[in-house]
A protein has these predicted regions:
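C-terminal regulatory/oligomerization modules of transcriptional regulators
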Residues: 1, 122-148
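N-terminal leader segment of winged-helix/HTH proteins
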Residues: 1-29, 76
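Hydrophobic alpha-helical segments typical of transmembrane helices
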Residues: 10, 22, 51, 111-112
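N-terminal helix-turn-helix DNA-binding core of bacterial DNA-binding proteins
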Residues: 20-65
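Charged, amphipathic alpha-helical coiled-coil/dimerization segments
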Residues: 71-128
Length: 148
């Protein structure tokens, strides 16, 4: 195996630093990483309500981690699960949960929007396009990691 390229080392460093910055933001907001991600997804849904499946998918967290964090949020009176149909569940924020999300995660989203808003539109589009290309290629190639 050849060594890791300089570009890949830089990429991994930046990814790690971004993760660390979001962890620091969660701490500054008084939230766990998983609670922040769940609240973030629920803020993005617009109604502070979203399917459990979508929360798992959009948060990047495992179902087990989401369920564990939701139990904690439920215990604190911030969220509840509502059955939908025969199998589905929606994650809903209580009034207290909505107030928490508006006072924490909504502020984080405003920071992110301000950063992207300060970039030229073509830079934002290029950044997002390259990130999507990387994600698509990585998913495709990762499918074959088990095959030798």
């Amino acid at each position: 195996m050849d060594g890791m390229s300089k570009e890949l080392r830089r990429f991994n460093y930046l990814m790690g630093e971004i993760d660390a910055a979001y962890h620091e933001a969660a701490l500054n907001l008084g939230l766990s990483d998983s609670a922040m991600r769940i609240l973030y997804v629920l803020c993005g849904c617009g109604s502070f309500r979203c399917s459990l499946r979508k929360v798992c998918l959009c948060s990047g967290l495992s179902k087990q981690t989401v369920n564990s964090a939701l139990r904690k949020l439920e215990g604190e009176g911030l969220a509840f699960l509502e059955p939908i149909g025969t199998k589905g569940k929606d994650v809903c924020l209580t009034d207290a949960g909505q107030a928490l999300a508006e006072g924490t995660v909504a502020r984080l989203i405003a920071v992110e929007d301000a950063i992207l808003g300060s970039w030229p539109a073509e830079d934002v589009e290029k950044y997002l396009s390259l990130a999507e290309q990387y994600l698509t290629a990585f998913r495709e190639k990762a499918k074959h990691l088990g095959n030798r």
